[in-house]
Curated annotation (Swiss-Prot):
GO terms for cellular component: ribonucleoprotein complex; ribosome. This is Large ribosomal subunit protein eL34. NCBIfam families: PRK04059.1. GO terms for molecular function: structural constituent of ribosome. Keywords: Ribonucleoprotein, Ribosomal protein. The keyword Hydrolase does not apply. Disulfide bonds: none annotated. GO terms for biological process: translation. The lineage of its organism: Archaea, Thermoproteota, Thermoprotei, Thermoproteales, Thermoproteaceae. PROSITE patterns: RIBOSOMAL_L34E.
């Protein structure tokens, strides 16, 4: 049985063949998903998702709700707020 830290499903199990011919299980972190819009669920453009060592403020666009909602949703919300 693996030790308690490796029993979590947040780690991905990968079967690896060793040079000696045995098959062992390696535990890896799961791949991160693409940032998505909170309203529509579509992938966000403008997010620099390749650079994870920087914070969200560096990666996200510098507009209001940048990195949270898509530009189309934001434009629609601004139009709605102005017209009311």
């Amino acid at each position: 049985m693996p030790r308690p830290a490796y029993r979590s499903r947040s780690l991905r199990r990968v079967k690896v063949k060793t040079p000696g011919g045995r098959t062992v299980v390696h535990y890896e972190k799961r791949a991160k998903g693409v940032p998505k819009c909170a309203v529509t669920g579509q992938p966000l453009g403008g997010m620099n998702s390749k650079v994870y060592r920087f914070g969200i403020s560096t990666r996200a666009p510098s507009r209001p709700y940048g990195g949270v909602v898509s530009h189309k949703v934001l434009a629609r919300a601004i139009r709605y707020a102005v017209r009311r």
